[in-house]
Amino acid sequence: MEFQHFQPAKILTPYIRHYYLFESSESVGYEDTVFPSGDMEIIFNLGNGIWESYQRGHYEKNPAIELWGQVTRPLQIRSVGVHLMLGVRFFPHATSFLLDDEIGIFNDQVSDLSDIMGRNIRDLHIQLAENSSITARIALLDTFFTDRLARAPKKVQRLHKVARILSSITQGSSENSIGRIADTHGITTRHLHKLVYQHTGLSPKSFDKIHRFKTSLKLISENKLPLTSIAYDAGYFDQSHFIRDFKSFTGLTPSAYLNNLSTVNQMLIN
C-alpha cells in the first residue's frame, strides 16, 4: 500500500486539510475499521478495486464518488482488488460550502456524491480518471473547488465564523464553557449549537469529544508517552473518562488498540 498527501491551492487551505492518493498494487482482500476523525471526505475511486462499508446492518458497495459523512462510531470497511483512490479531506466545518443539504443527514454513511452534486462532479471524476499525472489531477481538484468556493460568498463568510468558534471549542474548553464561548463570539448558546451542527453535523459537545479522541489517538500511535500522560495531554478529566470515550469510538481499550494499530487510521491520523 502507498499513501501520499498533497496540499491544495493556497486559497483552499482554510477549507481543505489535504488531498491524498491511496494505491495498492496487489489484488488481495482487506478489512479494517474507520474511527471518528471530525472531518468529512470525498473519495474518487479511479481503480478497479471494490470497497464496501458496513451500513444499515450489512455491507454495501461504495459508489465511484464517495461522500464520507461524519463518522461518530466505529465503521467497518472491507475491500478486494487493485485500488487507486484520490481523496479530499475537509476541515470539520468546510464541506458545507459544497452542499445544500443539512450536513448531519450524512453522518455514519458513505453516500453517492454524484446523486447529490450531479453532472459537475461526474465530469470531474471522468477528467481525473483520464489524467494519469498526479500534478494534473491536483490542478483539476484545485480548479473545481476554487470555482465552487467563488460561487458561495455568503457560505464562505459563515464558514469563517464557524471556524473561529470551533477553534475556541478545541482550545481547552469544557462542556460548561460553551456559554462563555458564545458570549465571546457575540451570539447566544442556542445559535452557537445551531451553527456548529449545521456546518459539522455534530453538536459542540460531540465535536469536542471527537477532537479529544483524535488527539489521544495520535499520541497513542506515536507510542512515546504512558497512557496516563496521554489522557491528561488530550484533555480528559481522568483515566476512566479517557478509556470510556476511547472505547466508544473504537470498540477497544487504549491498551488493546496499541497492540493492534489500525492501518487505515494510521494513514489518516494527520
For each feature predicted by the language model, list its residue ranges.
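Alpha-helical bundle regulatory/interaction domains
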Residues: 1-163, 169-173, 177-179, 185-189, ...
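Alpha-helical DNA-contacting segments of helix-turn-helix folds
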Residues: 156-160, 168-169, 196-220, 245, ...
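Conserved structured core elements
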Residues: 186, 207-210, 240
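Phosphate-/nucleic-acid-contacting segments
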Residues: 222, 226-229, 243
